[in-house]
Amino acid sequence: MTQLYPQYKKQLTTKIVLFSALSLLMMASLPNTYAEQYPDVPVPFKNGTGGKVENSLYVGLGSAGVSWFRLDTDKTGAGWQKVANFPGQPREQAVTVVLAGKLYVFGGVGKTNANDTQVRALDDAYRFDPQTNQWQQLATRAPRGLVGTVATTLDGSQAVLLGGVNKAIFDGYFTDLASAGSDEVRKSAVINAYFNQAPADYFYNRDVLIYDPQKNQWKSGGLLPFLGTAGSAISRMDNRLILINGEIKPGLRTAAVWQGLMQGNVLEWQPQPDLIGAETGSAQEGLAGAFSGISHKTVLVAGGANFPGAWKQFNRGHLYAHQGLEKQWHQQVYALVDNQWRIAGKLPQPLGYGVSIQGPDKVILIGGETTGGTATSAVTQLSWQGGKLHIE
């Protein structure tokens, strides 16, 4: 059997890029003399969320539980300060959008209440006011479960949410596992049935969700013209959204990059160059949990994780594409320059599933997990200046 499901097959073409010795030196990670180093987060921090209000960074949830922390970037010597605890249930993979000086936190994966017996795709929403240091649960629910979702804003007044798992299928998987109890045969059957499906059969969200806080209402921003993704990275450049990679089914990522431009009330999408391989001459498997942002009109993508060999198994007809494969965390940093991706340098360590916050012409990477899933508290700043990557 050669190829199954060609409509999902990623064209894993290899691109040979020759670098001179001088070019290799130029793309090496150099200290950024214009940036002040930020202190570590007080706790090992991964699968959380966060945002930036004026000159302060806010992060919380994930491995921090219900805790949230604030760093005044004008007074970094004071370190991270604890703010009010999140009033809802602990959760991972929530998303945050800053609108009119307030943090709006949506969804994630966790229990609906303290007595719940399993985790679920959550659809609730909360607002944090930095001026009063108070949280409020909003009287609304997202139209979809929000796990693996990404979120941003185009105008500072409304949130745009993209992608994520199908709540019924996701929740059902954990329900079925719980029902199997200690019966290993039943558990194995549940696991194989869940992972042994084509990408389209997971029904990842393709609806563009727009939340208007003034009306406390949700509306449609159109439909993605491609398979929904989970764990993508997202950046905003002017009035455009850049959606980068993500998984199209559990364990199988895509190298695709898309640009969304608001036309009227909907986003219209155009394909961008696929992300290149992590090494010269290698194919890109696609990334989930990567960091991204903009520096001097250049899109930067860093870290993330995948299962090398998953596409090879999938194209041989093995729908459980990552079965038997080892998850790999990455440290490469990519830059989109003149509409072409290049390998710009490397992070200090392999890293993914942290928080990306857009700074003034820099990308702030907060926390994340490194090889083996170990949480880190490090804060790293990336910028692109003079055709070079700078890391602080």
Swiss-Prot record:
EC number: 5.1.3.24
Kelch repeat windows: 56-100, 102-155, 157-192, 193-238, 241-290, 312-361, 363-392
Entry-linked InterPro entries: Kelch-typ_b-propeller, NANM, NanM_proteobact
Annotated localization: Periplasm
Catalytic activity: N-acetyl-alpha-neuraminate = N-acetyl-beta-neuraminate
SUPFAM superfamilies attached to this UniProt entry: Kelch motif (SSF117281)
Gene Ontology terms for molecular function: racemase and epimerase activity, acting on carbohydrates and derivatives
A Pfam family per the record: NANM
Protein keywords: Carbohydrate metabolism, Isomerase, Kelch repeat, Periplasm, Repeat, Signal
GO cellular component, one term: periplasmic space
Oligomer status and interactors: Homodimer.
Biological role stated in the UniProt entry: Converts alpha-N-acetylneuranimic acid (Neu5Ac) to the beta-anomer, accelerating the equilibrium between the alpha- and beta-anomers. Probably facilitates sialidase-negative bacteria to compete successfully for limited amounts of extracellular Neu5Ac, which is likely taken up in the beta-anomer. In addition, the rapid removal of sialic acid from solution might be advantageous to the bacterium to damp down host responses.
Record family assignment: Belongs to the NanM family.
Name under which the protein is recorded: N-acetylneuraminate epimerase
UniProt source species: Yersinia pestis
